[in-house]
């Protein structure tokens, strides 16, 4: 089993990586990974649009189908991420011989929604994506 958490969106060629992973895994081996959701990485800014009073208006989605490099800030540092569509993630896995076994767009738990201020805004757009696949 290979598990990756929030790393593949820093890799320029996911297709090449998927092919390598397929070679490394034995038949029946599994790949489970999380990435920032393509809706979240599309625009590059990764922030809400705010009104004049500072209230959240909406999350911008722009250039979704324009795959490639995005320069953004993460934890106060400039980083390079690579945006790709959901179709590109899934097709790269399928073309590398994987069978897709799961696709999840996680949402906050009821407890988080009750206890963390502003968490309800995380229901307005997907931020993360979890994909699982098996090598036949």
Where are these regions (language model features)?
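Core SAM-dependent methyltransferase catalytic element
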Residues: 96-98, 116-136
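A short glycine-rich, Lys/Arg-flanked "PGG" loop and its adjoining helix->strand segment in the class I
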Residues: 15-30
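Acceptor-substrate binding/catalytic loop of class I
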Residues: 35-48, 73-88
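Short catalytic micro-motifs in class I SAM-dependent methyltransferases
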Residues: 6-9
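Conserved class I S-adenosyl-L-methionine
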Residues: 30-68
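Class I S-adenosyl-L-methionine
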Residues: 69-72, 106-123
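A conserved beta-strand element that flanks and buttresses the S-adenosyl-L-methionine
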Residues: 3
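Short alpha-helix
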Residues: 68-69, 80-103
């Amino acid at each position: 089993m290979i598990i990756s958490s929030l790393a593949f969106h820093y890799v320029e060629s996911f297709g090449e990586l998927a092919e390598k992973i397929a070679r490394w895994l034995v038949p029946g081996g599994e790949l489970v990974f999380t990435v920032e959701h393509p809706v979240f990485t599309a625009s590059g800014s990764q922030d809400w649009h705010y009104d004049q009073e500072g209230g959240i208006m909406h999350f911008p989605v722009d250039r979704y189908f324009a795959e490639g490099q995005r320069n953004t800030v993460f934890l106060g540092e400039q980083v390079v991420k690579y945006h790709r569509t959901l179709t590109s993630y899934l097709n790269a896995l399928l073309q590398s011989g994987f069978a897709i076994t799961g696709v999840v767009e996680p949402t906050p738990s009821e407890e988080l929604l009750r206890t963390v201020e502003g968490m309800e805004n995380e229901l307005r757009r997907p931020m993360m994506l979890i994909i699982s696949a098996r090598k036949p």
